[in-house]
C-alpha cells in the first residue's frame, strides 16, 4: 500500500509543478499577444532642484512584452544626478548636451589622485587637511554617445556644458542579471529622492495589504522615512559603521533635503580629471593672450569646458582603432599614456590644480600587474576596471548604411562595444532625410524600442496575421515598442526623422525584406506571388540595394552607398 501511495503523491506533485510552470510560461507568452501597439509618452515626472526625471509606466502591455521600461533625464547647467544603482543593466543615449559620468565599480582601484606635492606645500595645516583626494576613472560624454551601466553598480552624471543634458535610458528589467521581479527599482545612495515609478509603490502596498498588519507600526515608520538606502539605518549605527560622528551620519541620511535626486552644484564641480585640466589650461592661455596683466594667484575652482567640436574630435580619435584593436584594456591604457605625455609637456609652465594619478612619479597600483601578468591577482583590473562603457553612435562617419538622398543607419553591438555582450543589449541610430524610407525589416532575435529624438515620421508595424498593429505618426519624445519578428517600416516627414532603437540582444540581427527577395530563387518567387519572370527580375534587382530608399530618386541611379 505504501508504494502505490508514494507513486501517486509523486505524480500529483509533478502534475502541480508542471501546471505552475505552464501557467507562468503562458502568462509570459500572453504578454506579447498584442492586437495593437501604442505610441507612448511619459506617465510620471519628478522635478528636482537641478533637473527633471520622466518615466514610462512599466505596466504598459508593450513594455511588459519587451521586458523593459524607459526613463528620460534632463540635467540643467551644473546639474548633478546623485549616485544610484539598479538590479539590471541600463543603456543610456545622450540626445543633447555633454557631461561627465562616474561609475563606482567594486574591487577597482582609485586611479585618479591629487598630486602628493600639493599636499606637502600646505605645511602648517593639520594632517587631516593634507589628505589627498582620489577616485575611480571619470568618463566624458557628448551628444550621440551611448553609455552602459552594469547592474548593481552605482553611477552619477554631471552636466559640464551650458545647455541642458537630455539622456534617454532603457532599463532592461527582464535581464538575467535581475534576480528580482520586473518591477523597476532605483536605489539612491544620497539625497531624499522622490518616487520615480509609482507603480512600484502600488505593488508594494498591495502586498502589504495582503500580508496583514503584523508589523504595522514598523511599516508606517518605514514609509514615513523614505529617501535613500542610508535612511533605513539609524544614525548611531551609521556613525559606528563609518567611524564618524552622528552629525555626519545624519547628513548622510539627508532627512530634510528638498533638492531630491538632482542637485545644482553652485560654482561648478571640481574633480580630478585630465580632460578638465587640459580645458582649464587652454582657458588660462587664452586669458594670458588677451590680458597683459598679472595672472591671478589661484585658478578658478571649476574649469570651463571646451567646445563640442573638440570633444567630438577626441572621441573620433578613440574610435579609429575599432576595426582591429588588440584588446580593450590596452587601447585605453595607450590613450591614457597619450594624455599623460601632453600633461607632462605643460608641467614646467604652471602648477596644476588637479592631475591624474598616472602623471605622478610613483606608479599606479594596477599598472604593475599589467606589465607582469604573472603577478595579477585575479585579472579584475584588465577585465572590469578597464572596460569601455561608452561609444558614440550618432556621428555621420560611423554610418553602416548611407544613402545621400534617404539617410543613414549606425549600429552599436557587442562587436563594436564588447561590454554589451555581458548585458545583452545593443542599439541602432537612424537618421532619415525628408521623405526618406527605411524599408520593411524585422529583428530576428530581439525586441526593440524606438525613441524619437528629432522630427516626425510615419511608422507601420505588422504582426504574424498580416494585421497592422500600429499605423500612425511618431514625433519627438514618443516611443514605440516593436516585438521580435514583427515587420516594421518608417518614412520621414517634411522635417526629417531621427530616432534611437534599443534592442534586447547584444548582437541583434536585422533582416531586410529586399535582401530576402534577392536570396530566394526567381522560380520560387514567381510561383509564390504568381509573377512573370520579368516581374520577378524587377522585384529582385530594380531600385536600391540597401534598406534606405528615397521614392523621388527611385527612377534614377539604383545604387546606394554602404559604409
UniProtKB/Swiss-Prot annotation:
CDD domains: cupin_11S_legumin_C, cupin_11S_legumin_N. PROSITE patterns: 11S_SEED_STORAGE (PS00305). InterPro entries: 11S_seedstore_CS, 11S_seedstore_pln, Cupin_1, RmlC-like_jellyroll, RmlC_Cupin_sf, Seed_Storage-Functional. Keywords: Allergen, Disulfide bond, Endoplasmic reticulum, Seed storage protein, Signal, Storage protein, Vacuole. Disulfide bonds join 32-65, 108-385. Pfam families: Cupin_1. GO terms for molecular function: nutrient reservoir activity. PANTHER family: GLYCININ G5, OS03G0336100 PROTEIN-RELATED. Hexamer; each subunit is composed of an acidic and a basic chain derived from a single precursor and linked by a disulfide bond. This is Glycinin G4. It comes from Glycine max.
Amino acid at each position: 500500500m505504501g508504494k502505490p501511495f508514494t507513486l501517486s503523491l509523486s505524480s500529483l506533485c509533478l502534475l502541480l509543478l508542471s501546471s505552475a510552470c505552464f501557467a507562468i510560461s503562458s502568462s509570459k507568452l500572453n504578454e506579447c499577444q498584442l492586437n495593437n501597439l501604442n505610441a507612448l509618452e511619459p506617465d510620471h515626472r519628478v522635478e528636482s532642484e537641478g533637473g527633471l526625471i520622466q518615466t514610462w509606466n512599466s505596466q504598459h502591455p508593450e513594455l511588459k512584452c519587451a521586458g523593459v521600461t524607459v526613463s528620460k533625464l534632463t540635467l540643467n547647467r551644473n546639474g548633478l544626478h546623485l549616485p544610484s544603482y539598479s538590479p539590471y543593466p541600463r543603456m543610456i543615449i545622450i540626445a543633447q548636451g555633454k557631461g561627465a559620468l562616474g561609475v563606482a565599480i567594486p574591487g577597482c582601484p582609485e586611479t585618479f589622485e591629487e598630486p602628493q606635492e600639493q599636499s606637502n606645500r600646505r605645511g602648517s595645516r593639520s594632517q587631516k587637511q593634507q589628505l589627498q583626494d582620489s577616485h575611480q576613472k571619470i568618463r566624458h560624454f557628448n551628444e550621440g554617445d551611448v553609455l552602459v551601466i552594469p547592474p548593481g553598480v552605482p553611477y552619477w552624471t554631471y552636466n559640464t556644458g551650458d545647455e541642458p543634458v537630455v539622456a534617454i535610458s532603457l532599463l532592461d528589467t527582464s535581464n538575467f542579471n535581475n534576480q528580482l521581479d520586473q518591477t523597476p527599482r532605483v536605489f539612491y545612495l544620497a539625497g531624499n529622492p522622490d518616487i520615480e515609478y509609482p507603480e512600484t509603490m502600488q505593488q508594494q502596498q498591495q502586498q502589504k495589504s495582503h500580508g496583514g498588519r503584523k508589523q504595522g507600526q514598523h511599516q508606517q515608520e518605514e514609509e514615513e522615512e523614505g529617501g535613500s538606502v542610508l535612511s533605513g539605518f539609524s544614525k548611531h549605527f551609521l556613525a559606528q559603521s563609518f567611524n564618524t560622528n552622528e552629525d555626519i551620519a545624519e547628513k548622510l541620511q539627508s532627512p530634510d533635503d528638498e533638492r531630491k535626486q538632482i542637485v545644482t552644484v553652485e560654482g561648478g564641480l571640481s574633480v580630478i580629471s585630465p580632460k578638465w585640466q587640459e580645458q582649464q589650461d587652454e582657458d588660462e592661455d587664452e586669458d594670458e593672450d588677451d590680458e597683459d596683466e598679472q595672472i591671478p594667484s589661484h585658478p578658478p575652482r571649476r574649469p570651463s569646458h571646451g567646445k563640442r567640436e573638440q570633444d567630438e574630435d577626441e572621441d573620433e580619435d578613440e574610435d579609429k582603432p575599432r576595426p582591429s584593436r588588440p584588446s580593450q584594456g590596452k587601447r585605453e591604457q595607450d590613450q591614457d599614456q597619450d594624455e599623460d605625455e601632453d600633461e607632462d609637456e605643460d608641467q614646467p609652465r604652471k602648477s596644476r590644480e588637479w592631475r591624474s594619478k598616472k602623471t605622478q612619479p610613483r606608479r599606479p597600483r594596477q599598472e604593475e600587474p599589467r606589465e607582469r601578468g604573472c603577478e595579477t591577482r585575479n585579472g579584475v583590473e584588465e577585465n572590469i576596471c578597464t572596460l569601455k562603457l561608452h561609444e558614440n553612435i550618432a556621428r555621420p562617419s560611423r554610418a553602416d548604411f548611407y544613402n545621400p538622398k534617404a539617410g543613414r543607419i549606425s549600429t552599436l553591438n557587442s562587436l563594436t562595444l564588447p561590454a554589451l555582450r555581458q548585458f545583452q543589449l545593443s542599439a541602432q541610430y537612424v537618421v532619415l532625410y525628408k521623405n526618406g524610407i527605411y524599408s520593411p525589416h524585422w529583428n530576428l532575435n530581439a525586441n526593440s524600442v524606438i525613441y524619437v529624438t528629432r522630427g516626425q515620421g510615419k511608422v507601420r508595424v505588422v504582426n504574424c496575421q498580416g494585421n497592422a498593429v500600429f499605423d500612425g505618426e511618431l514625433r519627438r519624445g514618443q516611443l514605440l515598442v516593436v516585438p521580435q519578428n514583427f515587420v516594421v517600416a518608417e518614412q520621414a516627414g517634411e522635417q526629417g526623422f531621427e530616432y534611437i532603437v534599443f534592442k534586447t540582444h547584444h548582437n541583434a540581427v536585422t533582416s531586410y525584406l529586399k535582401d530576402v527577395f534577392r536570396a530566394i530563387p526567381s522560380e520560387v518567387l514567381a510561383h509564390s506571388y504568381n509573377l512573370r519572370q520579368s516581374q520577378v527580375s524587377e522585384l529582385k534587382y530594380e531600385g536600391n540595394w540597401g534598406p534606405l530608399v528615397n521614392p523621388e530618386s527611385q527612377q534614377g541611379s539604383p545604387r546606394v552607398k554602404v559604409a
